[in-house]
Structures are given as C-alpha cells and as structure tokens.
C-alpha cells in the first residue's frame, strides 16, 4: 500500500 501514490490495494 502506498498512500503517497494513491494506491492502496493489499491482499
């Protein structure tokens, strides 16, 4: 997950 980039997809 990287909130800085704007993508938070952890599975």
Swiss-Prot record:
Question: Is Secreted one of the keywords?
Answer: yes
Q: Give the Gene Ontology MF terms in alphabetical order.
A: calcium channel regulator activity; toxin activity
Taxonomic superkingdom: Eukaryota
Q: Which GO terms describe its cellular component?
A: extracellular region
Q: Where is the protein found, in the record's own terms?
A: Secreted
Q: What is known of its domains?
A: The presence of a 'disulfide through disulfide knot' structurally defines this protein as a knottin.
Question: Where is it made, tissue-wise?
Answer: Expressed by the venom gland.
What does the sequence similarity comment in the record state about its family?
Belongs to the neurotoxin 02 (plectoxin) family.
**Record-given protein name:** Omega-ctenitoxin-Pb1a
């Amino acid at each position: 997950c990287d909130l800085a980039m704007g993508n938070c997809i952890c599975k």
